[in-house]
């Protein structure tokens, strides 16, 4: 057996579980923690780094720049948020962008993928108390205001 995390080895040998059923829930917990810490750093106007994700707050402009693997994926200010794909339309990039949208945009706004293409879901208003959204092609530099 190859080297694996002790808990996974235990579950394979004792309980018969396979690593593939365990890795995704564990990964999603880690991702949510990183994204929560990322959002907290932006709220507190602080520099922060964990793993492949970093936040740098520029006090002069009042903008927090979020990077994934060193590539800029977002600029967050008090008034708006600009998103980028950083050159990689990956699951992780999309996850980070959606965590930012969940925190700093209107509920329901975000980035999604359909047939290998990225799209942005943008709030445009409310009709009879119901939120209305439009879907637009994703472009690096898209601004949520």
Q: Where in the sequence are the language-model features?
A:
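Generic extreme N-terminus detector
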Residues: 5-6, 35
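Short, positively charged low-complexity motifs
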Residues: 1-4, 10-22
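Compositionally biased, intrinsically disordered low-complexity segments enriched
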Residues: 6-7, 28
């Amino acid at each position: 057996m190859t080297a694996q995390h002790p808990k996974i080895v235990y579950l394979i040998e004792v309980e018969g579980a396979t690593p593939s059923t365990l890795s995704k829930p564990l990964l999603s917990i880690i991702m949510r923690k990183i994204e929560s810490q990322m959002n907290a750093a932006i709220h507190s106007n602080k520099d922060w780094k964990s793993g492949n994700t970093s936040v740098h707050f520029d006090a002069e402009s009042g903008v927090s720049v979020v990077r994934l693997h060193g590539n800029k994926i977002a600029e967050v200010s008090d008034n708006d948020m600009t998103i980028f794909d950083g050159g990689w339309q990956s699951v992780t990039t999309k996850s980070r962008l959606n965590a930012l949208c969940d925190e700093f945009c209107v509920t329901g706004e975000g980035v999604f993928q359909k047939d290998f293409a990225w799209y942005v879901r943008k709030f445009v208003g409310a009709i009879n108390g119901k939120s209305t959204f439009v879907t637009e092609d994703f472009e690096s530099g898209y601004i949520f205001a």
